[in-house]
Amino acid sequence: MSQNIPFIAFNRGIISELALARADIKRVALSAEIMTNWIPRTLGSMTLRPGLGYIGSTKDNLASKSIPFVFSQTQKARLELTANIMRVWISDALITRAAVSTAVTNGTWPVNLTGWTDNDEAGAASTWAAGGYMQLLGTGTAAAIRDQQVTVAAGDANVEHALNIVVNRGPVTLMVGPTVGSDGYIAETSLGTGVHSLAFTPAGSFWIRLQSRLDRAILVDSCTIEAAGTMEVTTPWDASDLANVRPDQSADVIYVACVDTQQYKIERRATRSWSVVKFEPEDGPFRTANAGTMTLTPSVLSGNGSLTSSVNFFRSTHVGALFAVTSTGQSVLKDMTIVLDATNSILVEGTSTDRAFTIDLSGLSGTGNTVILQRSFDDATWVAVSGKSWTVDAVESYNDALDNQIVYYRLLCSVYAAGTTTAILTITTGSVRGICRITGYTGGTLVGIEVLKAFGAISASDDWEEGRWSDYRGWPSSVALYGGRLWWAGKDNVNGSVSDGYESYDHTVIGDSGPISRTIGSGPVDTINWMMPLDRLMLGGQMAEFQCMSNALDEPLTPTNFNIKQRSTQGSAAVNGIKVDNQGIFTQRGGARVFSMDMDAGSLNYVSSQLSALVPEIGDPGIVAMAVQRQPETRVHCVRSDGTVALLVFDKLEEVICWVEVETPGAGGFVEDVCVLPSGSGEKEDHVYYQVRRTINGATVRYFEKWATEVACRGDATTLLADSYIAYSGVAATVITGLGSL
């Protein structure tokens, strides 16, 4: 029998046609079979979907992925990633560079370093290296330095300039200032391996300084003034990678994971200065230590050299990998070229002859230098050993006779006058764990290395560890910041950094603050599609969702208090999950259904539930991107592979789960991506951006189009309900420019 049902609320949204006959379900009477471009409110009313305002085009109209950057309410940006390029939008405008005639002399170093002044400190060396690099090799204390004064024409003074610096093997220290060695324009900063676009405004001519104190070769590829136009920073992610980019942000740094790609960092160094650099921890994480007979032999204790394997082991894809080699016995060496230069320490323990070590000094005679032996009981506070001071070459043995005490020793240059004095301490007991990174591949038994932590011997050792990440072993696919640690997951493993040390994975750190490394080890876990820092750290695997937890509620995760448990077997699609308060929302592995992860009040564990139960086909033919808008209400934008959007109006407390559809069919409108920036002070709505592919005048274009605010769509003098609109506000005019996008 027909009925007249009063529509008292429009916040039930779409219901599946499979459920239309369910008259026994109260919400069916208030639901719709079709609800397109209508936006319900939790309150019960609804409105026409606001228009989409034209912001600008993607680079070369290519497909892109937008990443929100939010430092504060007032400091926000949208990062546009296209194939191997990043551009930055601030307040809906791209960062651009001004046209200036200023130029760096010989900024790419094709054959030499002409134009750059050598100001190396004693013992350090800055040289040209094959491949067209500036090579900086410090001593650990003395710096290799190159300077250049750059002339600025009068008309370019007080105009913003930008340096584009490409670092092949970092880090390198940069300073830019009005005088040599000063940093009034760009404060002294460390530049990692990658690309840097650094803005500054000189009042006149300025000096660039590139330097390194590290006792390993640092390679800089180029240093040039950026050309006029949009700022573009090179990235490692090609077009096929964009859907797999997984970011998480801490202050000015966005950490980025991507399937089969090394981790990177996007760094904001100032509002208009950005970098994209490799994430390169120097102390781990490492795989399980070698248990076989294969040995590795470093050719040097420090600096740059080679690593030799006793069997055919290395692959070209090992380049970039870390290796740790633990020696039998300890040997430390230092070429002293400045006062207070010192060797690393050796540890002396045991009794009797086990405590004897050798002191070897060369290049000392006739220099006027003085070298002393120092002792420490904590490897931090040093005192001179009485009677152990040298001004000429010497080789001698020393035994302190402090049986059963743990003592550290080192050699120090207390007086420096000239030359290079080589100081070596050697003891046959104890061990040193050195760490290197592979820089080049020669063959299966030989690779080039840079030493990050000095080795203890140049003899073969079967006590070695391989780094967990490399092109050979694979890279993590997801990242999250949780509990004061930086977490990476993928390749069946989850790794958490040292507490409050996001770039340290040093397993020698003792106690609860040490790093965490665990195998997930259940089901297909090669790719972790997302990590969400909810009340618990959640991982989205291909066949299950995992919860990282301690033994007791609210205890922090530590190396000895860490467990991984399956909490759902729905499995996750290759779409980044999103966090809504303490709840997670993700796409089920089929790619079309949307689930939430909620804390169960009884078990205090996270469980999954379907948000699309009453309209299971809402995600068809597949969801490719998601983002959450919190103001004026919580709305989850789910971009579908057919170019439309499934929009979830959501309020957990009010039990509102309302699905509607959004489309923009004009000019073949096809939504490909979504990004949300939060509202700021005085703003009532978040900023929602769609990337829309359209056909304009027969050409394919891709526009960023921004949702209008609801207040601008209420029928006032300005009503912004059109799509790809451009609004003009000003004096009466017969000609309006800037309409090329139409």
Predicted regions located by residue number:
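Beta-sheet repeat architectures centered on beta-propellers
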Residues: 2-98, 239-241, 523-526, 569, ...
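Predominantly extracellular/luminal cell-surface or secreted proteins
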Residues: 89-91, 175-181, 226, 326, ...
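Autoprocessing Asn-cyclization modules and mimics
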Residues: 95-112, 121-141, 154-156, 229-232, ...
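Extracellular and organelle-lumenal recognition/adhesion modules and their flexible linkers in secreted
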Residues: 97-229, 342-346, 353-355, 367-372, ...
